[in-house]
Amino acid sequence: MKITKTELFLRLAKPNEQGISRWVKTSEFAGEYKDLKLGNGGSWCRKDSPLARDYIVEFDKGLTSGNSIDAIRLNGFNQEKHFKQYIRKDIKDALKTRNCVMLGVNGKSENTKIEIDHKDGRKNNHRVSDIKTQKLEDFQPLCKAANDVKRQICKTCKETNKRWSAKNISGNPYAFYMGDENYSEELGCVGCYQYDPVEYRKSSVKRIAAEAAKYTSDYIFKKLYEEDNG
C-alpha cells in the first residue's frame, strides 16, 4: 500500500518523542523519497497540510541563493487548534450540481468544473470546520476559475485587512452589502461580494428599491405641494 507524503517525510526525518527532527535537506528527496520533491511551493508541507496540523514545520532558505526551500525540520508538536477543510457529504451533494454563483457555469473542463467553496475565506470559524455543526449556507458552488481568483482576493484581504470592493465589477451599485472596506472581527467576511454574491445581489435590489421609493415620494410631494415648500 502506497504511503502518503507526510508518512514518507516522517520516515526520513525521524522526529523524536517531542516531535523534533533534524534538518532534512531537500537534496535528500531522491530515490525512495523522490515523491517529496518540492513543486508549486511544496503542498505536502504547507501550513494547511496534514503535516503542519500535527507538527511545527520550519524551513531554511539560506543554504543556497534564491528563495527556494533548502531544508525542512519539525520543531515539536503543533498545539494550535487547526481549521479542518472537510465538508460534509450531504452539503457537497446539494451544491455540486448547481451552477457557479459568480460565473453561472457548471462544466467538465478544468476551469468550469464546480468546487465547493468555504464562503469565509479566512477559514477561522471552527463551527464551520466541524462537520457536525457546519451548515449548507456556510458554502457556495464556484467554478475552479472563480474559486482561484477568490482565493487570491481573500489572501490580499488577510494581509491588508482591506476588503474587496464589489464596484471593481462594472455595474455593481454598491461596494459592500454590509460594512465597509475595513475588515472587522464583528462582521468578518459578511458583506463582501466574494463571501456571498447571491446575497449581494438580493441586498442591492432591496436597497435600490428603497432608494427609488424615497426619491419618488420626495419628488411627488415637491410636485404636489411646491407652494408649501416655497
UniProtKB/Swiss-Prot annotation:
One of its GO terms (biological process) is DNA restriction-modification system. The keyword Ion transport does not apply. Pfam families: ICEA (PF05315). Signal peptide: none annotated. One of its GO terms (molecular function) is type II site-specific deoxyribonuclease activity. Its EC number is 3.1.21.4. Keywords: Endonuclease, Hydrolase, Nuclease, Restriction system. It catalyses: Endonucleolytic cleavage of DNA to give specific double-stranded fragments with terminal 5'-phosphates. The keyword Nuclease applies. This is Type II restriction enzyme NlaIII. The lineage of its organism: Bacteria, Pseudomonadati, Pseudomonadota, Betaproteobacteria, Neisseriales.
